[in-house]
């Protein structure tokens, strides 16, 4: 009798285990580094109301993430910090084109020590070391280079630039005093800066508007939960969270 009861309980446990596994779904997100906090908050909110859904978040430079996806890294939704890397994957048929949409917008700023006399773009040529994200893979760095070129100061800055792997590392260099200032996004400066402050906002006519597109990958388009999460990201609730973190949502 005792063995029978134990056997029944064991069988029931296995049934419950496999039933739970059947409803468990991982959603893999590849996310531009500057979206770390807001996407983490939004994915946590979604998971709380969708039993069995868990998120695997991969944060980094948009170009690095795109190359990872191209190489077969698991990803259901890609969030880029510019249109270029979204187009890169679209051209390679690695995105569900119909799902491409705008997640948010941002602004490029320059941060430095509070006592700094730098108040405009032309002033940065007086500095010795300036951090930007590597333009080859970091959109913030590419935006900065475009601003330098348009302002006609690119030649004066070329030997002063310190390249960072992503925009967060760029901010960290400035915060630790390893550079005299850094070009980062406004949201990063407002949320993460400890020892530096925003010295000026880069004129919008000097670089393309910072746009964060998002899209499902072919794998993600097969997951109902990933599709539902993408829809949630376009909701009024999600936009309220984006605005709270300093992003522009229109």
Describe every region a protein language model picked out:
Residues 1-7:
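Positively charged n-region of N-terminal signal peptides that target proteins for export
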Residues 8-19:
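Bacterial N-terminal signal peptides
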Residues 23-49, 54, 58-59, 63, ...:
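Exported/periplasmic ABC-transporter solute-binding proteins
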């Amino acid at each position: 009798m005792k063995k029978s009861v134990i056997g029944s309980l064991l069988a029931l446990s296995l049934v419950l285990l496999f039933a739970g596994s059947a409803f468990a779904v991982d959603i893999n997100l590849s996310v531009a580094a500057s979206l770390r906090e807001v996407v983490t908050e939004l994915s946590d909110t979604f998971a709380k109301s969708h039993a069995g859904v868990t998120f695997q978040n991969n944060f980094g430079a948009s170009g690095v993430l795109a190359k990872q996806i191209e190489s077969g890294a698991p990803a259901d939704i890609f969030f880029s910090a510019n249109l270029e890397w979204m187009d890169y994957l679209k051209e390679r048929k690695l995105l569900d084109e119909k799902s491409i949409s705008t997640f948010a917008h941002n602004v490029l700023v320059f941060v430095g020590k509070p006592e700094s006399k730098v108040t405009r773009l032309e002033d940065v040529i007086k500095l010795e070391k300036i951090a930007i994200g590597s333009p080859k893979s970091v959109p913030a760095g590419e935006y900065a280079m475009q601003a330098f070129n348009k302002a006609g100061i690119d030649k004066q800055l070329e030997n002063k630039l310190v390249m960072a792997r992503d925009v967060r590392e760029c901010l960290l260099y400035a915060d630790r005093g390893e550079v005299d200032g850094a070009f980062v996004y406004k949201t990063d400066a407002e949320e993460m800066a400890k020892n530096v402050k925003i010295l000026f906002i880069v004129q919008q006519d000097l670089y393309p508007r910072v746009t964060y597109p998002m899209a499902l990958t072919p794998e993600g388009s097969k997951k109902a939960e990933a599709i539902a999460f993408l829809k949630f990201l376009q909701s009024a609730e999600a936009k309220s969270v984006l605005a709270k973190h300093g992003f522009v949502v229109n």
